[in-house]
Regions:
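N-terminal secretory signal peptides that target proteins for export/translocation
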Residues: 1-5
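Bacterial N-terminal signal peptides
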Residues: 7-20
Length: 306
């Protein structure tokens, strides 16, 4: 069976949290206004989240059927960096540098990405991306894949990307005491945001996003579904990201991501059992700006005397 490869075409984005004041009910704000607010929010966020570094603890479990016994568990420790790339069409990439697998170091933890990116971006970006691609080989499963970016869905809300998708309001939810509107999305046509293998390069994305019911565009949760067919094999990938307020940064940041990659094979007599199922749970912490120590994490600016 051909190796599974999912590659992200656009940079991952994140959103700046807004104030709760002025919240409108889900029935009081139109879908157009919600999407406009989210798009404006993404644009305004570029400076606030530039070169943000975080720590990722990622546990993956491999099964040979859904709900079956775990065949293998892998625990990955990584540094992740959200970087701004001028002229790339979208403002954000997420780069992952694995430093530990199952408690054993795979390299010296020396903030490699951070050191590359605090200097001239043009000089360090190519090497940083090579490091991130190298880390994809530590994922469990038959093929290398890197769709597992917690902020990927936020890219779909960028004003230049929204026309590629259809959106529909579905319901409401309360997250951290705030009212959010559930919106379903579906990618309309190629070329697609997420790229597949050469034999099937276009992978149409679908899912849901929860946008604050007010006017600030804050996203509290995202859900992504991808499906790729190669010969007799069908791979379905899902990822759900939870966001929470992070006062030191004055942002809503991704704190947890659940993902699943499931591959099934169709034989001459119909579907067989799943070839493999990989479930992942990633947790994020230690958000700070590149070049700033964890003891010097961002602080909300103090009011200045007039």
């Amino acid at each position: 069976m051909p190796a599974r490869v999912l590659r992200v075409l656009v940079p991952a984005l994140a959103l700046l949290a807004g104030a709760e004041a002025g919240t409108a009910g889900a029935d009081e704000i139109s879908l157009v206004d919600l999407l406009r607010s989210a798009g404006d929010y993404v644009i305004g966020y570029a400076d606030a989240f530039r070169l943000v570094v975080a720590e990722e603890e990622y546990v993956q479990r491999l099964r040979t059927s859904p709900g079956g016994p775990v065949q293998e568990t892998r625990r990955l420790g990584s540094d992740v960096v959200f970087v701004h790339v001028s002229g790339a069409g979208f403002p954000w990439w997420l780069l992952r540098d694995v430093y530990e697998v199952n408690g054993s170091p795979v390299r010296d933890r020396q903030a490699r990405l951070e050191k590359l990116l605090v200097g001239p971006m043009e000089d360090g970006l190519a090497r940083a991306r090579a490091i991130a691609d190298e880390g994809a080989r530590f994922n469990l499963g038959r093929g290398h894949w890197n769709f597992n970016v917690p902020t990927l869905v936020l890219a779909f809300l960028h004003p230049s990307v929204q026309p590629r998708f259809s959106f529909a309001k579905k319901g409401r939810a309360t997250i951290e005491g705030r009212s959010f509107v559930e919106i379903a999305f579906r990618e309309l046509s190629p070329p697609t945001v997420v790229r597949g293998p050469d034999s099937h390069p276009d992978i149409l994305a679908a899912g849901r996003v929860w946008i604050h019911a007010g006017r600030d565009g804050t996203v509290g949760r995202t859900e992504l579904t991808l499906e790729v067919r190669e010969g007799r094999a069908t791979t379905r990938a899902t990822a759900t990201t939870e966001y929470r307020p992070y006062p030191p940064l004055a942002l809503w940041v991704p704190v947890e991501m659940h993902d699943r990659v499931q591959t099934d094979v169709v034989g001459a007599r119909g579907p067989s059992n799943s070839v493999e199922v990989v479930d992942g749970l990633a947790a994020y912490s230690g958000f700070r700006q590149a070049g700033v120590s964890t003891q010097e994490e961002f602080r909300v600016p103090e009011p200045q005397p007039r």
